[in-house]
Swiss-Prot record:
This protein's name: Serine/threonine-protein kinase greatwall
UniProt lineage: Eukaryota, Metazoa, Chordata, Craniata, Vertebrata
Chief localization: cytoplasm
Organism per entry: Xenopus laevis
Region span, Disordered: 321-353, 410-435, 556-624
Biased composition (Acidic residues): 608-617
Amino acid sequence: MGIVAETSQNGDTSLCSEKKFTVPQPPSIEEFGIVKPISRGAFGKVYLARRKNNSKLFAVKVVKKADMINKNMVQQVQAERDALALSKSPFIVHLYYSLQSANNIYLVMEYLIGGDVKSLLHIYGYFDEEMAVKYISEVAMALDYLHRHGIIHRDLKPDNMLISNKGHIKLTDFGLSKVTLKRELCMMDILTTPSMAKPKRDYSRTPGQVLSLISSLGFNTPAGGRTQGSLNQQTEGMRGNASTPLLMKKRESLVKGNKLMISCPEASLSSPSIPVKCLTPNLLKCRTQFATSSTSSQSRICLSSLESECGSPRWENCSQDAEAPPYFNSSRVKDSSSEQARSKKPTGSSASQNLKRLEFAFSPIVDRRTGKKAGFQDETGELSDTPLATLNAKGVIRKCLYENKAQEKPKDFDKTGQGELGKFTSSPDSPPWLANGSVAPIQFNDEEKTEKMGVKRNYDLVEKSPEQELLQDKKTNTDYKRGCAITDYPVSQSTGLTMEINSLFLSELRNSANKYASDRKSEDKYISAPRTLEKLDSGNPVAKNLLCELDDNCERDGEVSSTSEGEDRKERLNQDSSSTGMSVTENQIDRDLSHVDKSIKELSFEESQSENSEEITPDNKGIPFMAENDERVQSKYEPNTSILPDSLQNVLASPAPASAMTNPRRKPMVAFRSYNSPINVSNVSEPSKISMNSADKIHFSLECTGSFPMAVTPAQNKVQGLIETPYRTPKSVRRGGIQVDHERILGTPDYLAPELLLRKSHGPAVDWWALGVCLFEFLTGIPPFNDETPSQVFQNILNRDIPWPEEEEEVLSVNAQSAIEILLTIDPTKRAGLKDLKAHPLFHGMEWEELQYQPMSFIPQPDDETDTTYFEARNNAQHLKVSGFSL
């Protein structure tokens, strides 16, 4: 009964007590070979790769971990992998494997040979109505599938629509997507992934694929440094190994196995670990020097092809990759020791053995199929977080670096780096090769920064996240050293690329909004004179948003007593800000915010002390605090926006309480930091205790910030006697407003929805807005809000300025224009969805359940299976240069 029987030589039969099973394992990136690069996006590059065992073609998206850490995009990479892993739809690109190495993440997806719709649009100019309707229908089905499973794409555009070999559309590039799954993927999520009504074998996944898709993505890269909690433990472990034999013995007992001892004692006495990113050129030189990467053993002892090509600074020409981040374009310190030692060092067996050990320790993705421990794996079956997490790898790499230091000759830096060299060589903790002056001269470039190998960078050279860069004052173009000249405004093509929207772009919108309010001043008594901020393009965005939104709400918040008082208010504001550096608005806050009992300044720390506080019961403690669901409160706080144009009524209208909320008590002077002073964005707090009676006041406070708190805890009924000064502004509130989840605006300017620009809470409606933009672009050839600069694009979006074609041969049909109108609705609650599109006359006669089988207008005709010419039109139009390499 399931027991294997074996027959011996004498014919007797015996029962075998063991049965061997093949344990499924995810594949290694070594099993894929690069064919050619395909395209490049904002956060990664895509390559055409071939599986070595079955010659099947895949599209491999390579994302650098250090790049994602520097851009603060770690969570977005995780969201992209999860969104693709959870999706099984004929209109969404299929993800096969999710692999990773020490420096990169590899998403192995299906290869769609037809290219992207953006390239096809550049070739066609524009699509006819039938072709555009078919494409929009398939994309609408994909969006509906994603939204039903809690996924918002948030970067929908023709660039992210791929064409299959039969001409059908599939969505890709979920790098900015939002997944409601608040945990890591498990096997049940992959196995029970919702699919079509009749699942096909095309959507089934092998055990190796499932294991790779549920694996945790580790961003503890050697280049970026280990940032997780295991850093201290691993550091202590390495220090223990390098200190005394007693601690080394203790570590051996913990891992329950004997480790290879280091043959050179000087390696254990060296300085702390060196970043792997700087060791890659040395490794490549050593490979060339000793010629150990033969054809028979290349896949076993050498770096993987993808790892060496994508991780090495030598792989790409920096001049060809001008749009890459400065971190990867910076020049490296040349290792002259390897160049000098080529003619001096013998290529003996010991050197070759050391190189093998170095490469074996450096690459964590080799020797996956054998029973040996790859990447110095211990007997517990768990790989270390990084290849340098063990003492063996650390010692081997240092040994290779220190071997020839006695033969090196001191050389001087150029004048640009001479000061830095003296600073590090004079330190007692500096590495021996710096102490001996054995650093090769660097050919300094005035437009690049230099990163020293093995030396911790200064603060000025540390890569900063986008939020940290916004905290600094704006610099001029001459302050930045770039590989190419930059203009005052980006070119028109840049509005079609994915980017992070800075406050610099949004500040121009506020200026135009203030100008518009000034023009309407004489017509409406509820709008006061606009107040222009001092420096909208510098300082912290949180403080600017707080002040701008307070100004916008207060200007529509009631009748100003007199014009002279407003002018007097401005004079005092300018005097205080120029003398003390603080924007003190005493009378302004007194008059404009005197009606608000609890504004955003006290929301984090203070309670409303009302005599008739409502008792919290199990019946009412689940009531949401959003007063927009209450018709009584909504009618009470309805603002007067009838004087505004129809296109701006829904955008600029804010349900801020007007003069109906009266409070006879005057508030004290409130001080805000200056616009130019840096503010710590992370030093904010969530609301802790809010009474149930202040629901209406909470509503106004939340509208000031354009978001809602993550959690609101009602206050206890007992009176706390520690609150003696309920109107004191807490210190942390002066540093900015409540931190919201979606503070950054990421996306392509032409396709952003108005609620994203206004930093309001958003949902799946942002994808339907982008679909309306795509429909207009399909029929006309250009996006409806396209302009010269991103700020002008944003202004067109908020104004809903759509340039409808007027000529006879280019005019859109009534049904097409109506479909665009219902998709490009400012109010996200009234925006059309799949149900509305199915009932629209433009899509009349469309067989929605059989879309994947309908004949398409365009069917790719490639020269061969590796033809990538359908991707070139978009790359050339957007000036994207895909780096080449030698196979």
